[in-house]
Amino acid sequence: MTSVSCRSRHWVIGDVHGCADSVEALLERLPATDRLIFCGDAINRGPAIAAAMERIWGLVEQGRAVWLKGNHEQDLVTALRCGLWQGQPSLSRCDTYRHLGDSLCRQWLERLDHLPLAYWGKGWVATHAGFDPSTWQPDLRVRLGFWQHYDGRFGDVVIGHTPGPHVRHLRGIVMVDTGACYGGNLSAYCPETGEVVSVPGLRPESARPLPGLRPALLSGR
């Protein structure tokens, strides 16, 4: 896992899902001296997956950003190693594999496999989906179990994974996925100040349908 840096402020950024233009727009609005934490699922779904990956990785190499692993990155790593995508013998159903091709995907394999699972700040932690409440280890797919049982032990937990209409707060959990690839926004949250900066994601006519998630669980405040 990745520890806190010496930079004074951080911005935790929700699921990019191939929305490279939104990443560029967000970067224009965030101070160049602050550190960026991309909380996973940068790949799949959107129209500019390769561009988003290259841009984010460039920021990582510059020391400005951390890219956390999401379930989509883990699924691609698993698929490349076993030759199956979601139980099917063809990887062509994976958006990233289709966009990049086999050779380029395999060039990304080790980088994606070694992405950190969490970033620890002072009084807060960022991770993709939350923590397994039975072990309190990062879990890339957890939802309701973590939301219901989080006891505040890590301070604020800033997560992506579950899209909603705006940044939501739920008993010490801050949910920053605002559905960029679904016609919503790409949002960044500053855990030191509580500020939110959002830019438009895909235009509604180009976006994917929002998954059927329970609105009462997503609304927060």
Regions of interest found by a model, annotated:
Residues 1-8, 28, 57-60, 117-120, ...:
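A short acidic-Thr-Gly-centered motif at the start of a beta-strand
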Residues 7-9, 33-34, 62-64, 122, ...:
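A general structural motif
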Residues 45-125, 144-149:
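Active-site neighborhood of divalent metal-dependent phosphoester bond hydrolases
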Residues 1-55:
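N-terminal active-site segment of His-dependent metallophosphoesterases
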Residues 5, 149-221:
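Acidic, His/Gly-rich catalytic cores of divalent-metal-dependent hydrolytic chemistry
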